[in-house]
Amino acid sequence: MSLFDRLFILSQHLTPQHALSRAIGKLADSRTPFIKNTFIKWFIKRYNVNMQEALLPSAEDYTCFNDFFTRALKDGARPIHPDVSRLVTPVDGAVSQAGSIDYGKIFQAKGHSFSLVELLGGDLQRAQPFIGGEFATIYLSPKDYHRIHMPIDGELREMIFVPGKLYSVNPLTTENVPALFARNERVVCIFDTPLGPMSMTLVGAMIVASVETIWAGRVAPMSKTVRSYTYKPGEVTIKRGEEMGRFCLGSTVVMTFPKGAMRWREGLKAETPVRLGEDLGKILQTVATVDEQKTD
């Protein structure tokens, strides 16, 4: 690791992460035309953002930087895989890791794993269905589309806000900060789906102003304790491919599935680029199938 990389990692330990993120968040919400237009145009050029696929292609079309960052795409820009026996990729990004959850641990990077229980807020009962199951972690780079969609039909059961640090989640930090995704502030969403329970964890990061969901808006309790919100059956139902949330300044999504419920598509591994709507994996069994097997 270079000296610059070491200094970058060290600076994150020393930086007042939440104060910096709040300050950047206020700037990103500024509606002053000169500020927001300058910021947006610089960002487009700096990260080579493809505005040809954006529904609104000009910086002047957006009310603030966050409005631009969570921009909508043109119809048809991300077709959803037509085979409903396949899970679809929920975001644009790159796979950080994907594989099995072994002994309650999720692989982060060489030499680093983290606890499934801690990721999901410290509740063993909540994590139990996913032990021995499958996980995938997808990193969204600054230039990516930052809305998050459903990989399968789901009915929201619980949302958990977990306070924590706000380290960067770029590949360099992921490789060098232990248990990163179980240390950063995050929003955990537990869904009931045709293949059983599914968790989608939206991980906050340095200068991520906030995380939003379609049912709760901005999730920013400013709490130092874990907070859980439960939902009645049918209260929040989201179809495969529909939006479920978004990052106001990007981050990472961690998904978990039960053992034997699905299989990742062939070739899905670290650093694989992915796009919303693409084939992510095959559904191997549904809750209905399991129930039928029990009654036979």
Curated annotation (Swiss-Prot):
One of its GO terms (molecular function) is phosphatidylserine decarboxylase activity. It is an enzyme of class 4 (lyase). It is a peripheral membrane protein. It holds the Pfam family PS_Dcarbxylase. InterPro entries: PS_Dcarbxylase (IPR003817), PSD-B (IPR033177), PSD_type1_pro (IPR033178). It comes from the Bacteria. The active site is at D92 (charge relay system), H149 (charge relay system), S251 (charge relay system), S251 (schiff-base intermediate with substrate). Binds 1 pyruvoyl group covalently per subunit. Is synthesized initially as an inactive proenzyme. Formation of the active enzyme involves a self-maturation process in which the active site pyruvoyl group is generated from an internal serine residue via an autocatalytic post-translational modification. Two non-identical subunits are generated from the proenzyme in this reaction, and the pyruvate is formed at the N-terminus of the alpha chain, which is derived from the carboxyl end of the proenzyme. The keyword Lyase applies. The record marks G250, S251 as: Cleavage (non-hydrolytic). Its cofactor is pyruvate. Keywords: Cell membrane, Decarboxylase, Lipid biosynthesis, Lipid metabolism, Lyase, Membrane, Phospholipid biosynthesis, Phospholipid metabolism, Pyruvate, Zymogen. Its EC number is 4.1.1.65. GO terms for cellular component: plasma membrane. The keyword Methyltransferase does not apply. Its main location: membrane. It catalyses: a 1,2-diacyl-sn-glycero-3-phospho-L-serine + H(+) = a 1,2-diacyl-sn-glycero-3-phosphoethanolamine + CO2. One of its GO terms (biological process) is phosphatidylethanolamine biosynthetic process. Pathway: Phospholipid metabolism; phosphatidylethanolamine biosynthesis; phosphatidylethanolamine from CDP-diacylglycerol: step 2/2. HAMAP family: PS_decarb_PSD_B_type1. Heterodimer of a large membrane-associated beta subunit and a small pyruvoyl-containing alpha subunit. Catalyzes the formation of phosphatidylethanolamine (PtdEtn) from phosphatidylserine (PtdSer). Belongs to the phosphatidylserine decarboxylase family. PSD-B subfamily. Prokaryotic type I sub-subfamily. This is Phosphatidylserine decarboxylase proenzyme. It comes from Hahella chejuensis (strain KCTC 2396). The lineage of its organism: Bacteria, Pseudomonadati, Pseudomonadota, Gammaproteobacteria, Oceanospirillales.
